[in-house]
Amino acid sequence: DDLFNINAGIVKLFGVTTLDVVR
């Protein structure tokens, strides 16, 4: 989903991809 991709990009800015962990 686009929302998940956008959130993933925002999280990556923090240096941690929590969404990737959830997936």
From Swiss-Prot:
This is Malate dehydrogenase. Belongs to the LDH/MDH superfamily. MDH type 1 family. Homodimer. It comes from the Eukaryota. The keyword NAD applies. GO terms for molecular function: L-malate dehydrogenase (NAD+) activity. GO terms for biological process: tricarboxylic acid cycle. The keyword Kinase does not apply. Its EC number is 1.1.1.37. It comes from Pseudotsuga menziesii. It catalyses: (S)-malate + NAD(+) = oxaloacetate + NADH + H(+). Keywords: NAD, Oxidoreductase, Tricarboxylic acid cycle. NAD(+) binds at N7. Substrate binds at R23.
